[in-house]
Amino acid sequence: MVFPSPLQGVDIRHNKDRKVRRKEPKSQDIYLRLLVKLYRFLARRTNSTFNQVVLKRLFMSRTNRPPLSLSRMIRKMKLPGREGKTAVVVGTITDDVRVQEVPKLKVCALRVSSRARSRILKAGGKILTFDQLALDSPKGCGTVLLSGPRKGREVYRHFGKAPGTPHSHTKPYVRSKGRKFERARGRRASRGYKN
């Protein structure tokens, strides 16, 4: 019978060793990969954090690159000190029909929806691609980095404290919104209690 020697070590748990972050985009889109190649170079060769942030955002998933509406972009570009600067969005710019007048804007984005594109250009604005931006301002001077609301997706309404617990405003997953479905106990004072 062989006894374990007292000098044996304990096996180290390696499951937490890896840093979980993207080093490249999941997408196989060749145009996106060319942009990654370009901004990898710029992030390495320039001392600007702008290029590093753009590179990191190019790696992100679609849910982490939410679309930015025209109205939100106009509102953000109206803030003091942002006149004449280029709005940079690593994602899509979408139209907002609630906006009546579009000011003259200089914009750089991965994609611009057709109606948003026509409205920006009609107002005398300019739309750049990221390779044009790299030539225009390689260090990100005169730019404003914007992004859409990441928690704007409907699914975020279901996250948080369990629905039905006190002070919870979490949306329950219900098969139907009828009178008989999660509308009585806990929802009105006459039926037990009201949250």
UniProtKB/Swiss-Prot annotation:
InterPro entries: Ribosomal_eL18, Ribosomal_eL18/eL18-A/B/_CS, Ribosomal_uL15/eL18, Ribosomal_uL15/eL18_sf. GO terms for biological process: cytoplasmic translation. The keyword Ribonucleoprotein applies. It comes from the Eukaryota. It holds the Pfam family Ribosomal_L18. There is a cross-link at K126, K171 (Glycyl lysine isopeptide (Lys-Gly) (interchain with G-Cter in SUMO2)). It is found in: Cytoplasm, Cytosol; Cytoplasm; Rough endoplasmic reticulum. One of its GO terms (molecular function) is RNA binding. Keywords: Cytoplasm, Endoplasmic reticulum, Isopeptide bond, Phosphoprotein, Ribonucleoprotein, Ribosomal protein, Ubl conjugation. Belongs to the eukaryotic ribosomal protein eL18 family. Component of the large ribosomal subunit. This is Large ribosomal subunit protein eL18. The lineage of its organism: Eukaryota, Metazoa, Chordata, Craniata, Vertebrata.
